[in-house]
């Protein structure tokens, strides 16, 4: 096979290794015969076939291999057992090492590092000061940049973007048009996809799923088997966990907690220090806030408001424009509806129905 380049006498020392500048022996691609390239340790580093090339001050050494039409340029370094192939490009001050692979049309540039057994392929881009390591995979048209870290067995693909100081690790998957940014962390077996966003100091972990156009930010945490979707907003220091579901246009914020098998949906607002758990549902345009607790199989819906230190439990229902607040308790199979109001230390229980414009207090 006719060689396309030779090693020259011009050398540099990198990490105790002697590297040789290469010179083209024939025309190929945009390389002309006589063009000087970058540096390699030996001819095993750069294939003598295909259009692959090492440009300028880039260096390839160790047992690293570059072949196909791959390009290594600027001050990029590829070493150890790394493999760069197809039409991949490594540029800027990027480093690819360990047993990492970059192939197809992927690009690694800036000060990014890809190492371990990580793979970057498809049309994916890794840039800035991002680090991709472990067995992580970045592919599709995904972008990982800024100071992001993707590691473990994490997978980022589709058109997903990971940036800021965000971290994606464990067996987490981020895909679709999802965005993870700020100091957010997505890990364990969590999945974030579609157009969902996780940012700020938020954490999504366990087997939690965030999808559609849902947003999780602030110091919020979503974990366990919780599912958040639709146009939902979860923020502040809110926590969603267990098998809880929050969806549609619902909002959960402040220090609110939703867990167990609870569901919050519609245009419901849940905030303050309240807690919803068990099989309770809050939906419609209902609001639950302050230190209220809703549990059991209770349902709050319509335009109802529950706040203060109220307890709503068992099979109780609050709906219409009803308001229950202060230290009131609504339990058993009781119903509070229409424009009724229950407050102070009132207890509504059994099969009681408080409706119309009734007012109950103690």
Task: Kindly label every feature range from the protein language model.
Residues 49, 60-61:
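Extracellular repeat-rich scaffold modules on cell surfaces
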Residues 54, 60, 66, 70-72, ...:
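Fold-core signature of tandem repeat domains
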Residues 1-51, 111, 146, 248, ...:
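Terminal amphipathic alpha-helical/low-complexity segments used for targeting or macromolecular assembly
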């Amino acid at each position: 096979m006719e060689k396309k380049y030779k090693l020259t006498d011009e050398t540099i020392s990198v990490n105790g290794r002697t590297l040789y500048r290469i010179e083209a022996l024939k025309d190929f691609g945009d390389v002309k015969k006589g063009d000087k390239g970058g540096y390699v340790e030996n001819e095993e580093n750069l294939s003598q076939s295909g259009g692959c090339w090492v440009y300028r001050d880039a260096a390839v050494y160790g047992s690293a291999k570059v072949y196909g039409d791959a390009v290594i340029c600027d001050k990029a370094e590829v070493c150890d057992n790394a493999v760069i192939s197809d039409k991949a490009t490594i540029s800027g001050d990027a480093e690819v090492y360990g047993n990492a692979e970059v192939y197809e049309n992927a690009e690694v540039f800036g000060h990014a590092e890809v190492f371990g057994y990580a793979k970057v392929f498809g049309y994916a881009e890794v840039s800035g000061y991002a680090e991709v390591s472990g067995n992580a995979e970045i592919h599709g048209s995904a972008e990982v940049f800024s100071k992001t870290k993707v590691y473990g067995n994490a997978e980022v693909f589709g058109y997903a973007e990971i940036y800021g100081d965000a971290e994606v690790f464990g067996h987490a998957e981020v895909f679709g048009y999802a965005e993870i940014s700020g100091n957010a962390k997505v890990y364990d077996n969590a999945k974030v996809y579609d157009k969902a966003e996780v940012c700020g100091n938020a954490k999504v972990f366990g087997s939690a799923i965030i999808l559609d156009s849902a947003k999780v930010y602030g110091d919020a945490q979503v974990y366990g088997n919780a599912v958040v979707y639709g146009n939902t907003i979860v923020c502040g220091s809110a926590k969603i966990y267990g098998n809880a579901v929050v969806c549609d246009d619902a909002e959960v914020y402040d220090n609110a907690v939703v867990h167990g098998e609870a569901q919050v949906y519609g245009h419901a607002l849940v905030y303050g220090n309240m807690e919803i758990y068990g099989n309770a549902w809050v939906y419609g345009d209902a609001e639950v806030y302050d230190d209220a607790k809703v549990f059991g199989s209770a349902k709050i819906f319509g335009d109802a408001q529950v706040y203060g230190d109220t307890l709503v439990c068992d099979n109780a229902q609050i709906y219409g424009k009803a308001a229950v607040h202060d230290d009131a308790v609504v339990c058993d199979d009781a119903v509070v509806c229409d424009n009724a109001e229950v407050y102070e230390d009132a207890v509504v229980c059994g099969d009681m129905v408080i409706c119309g414009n009734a007012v109950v207090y103690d």
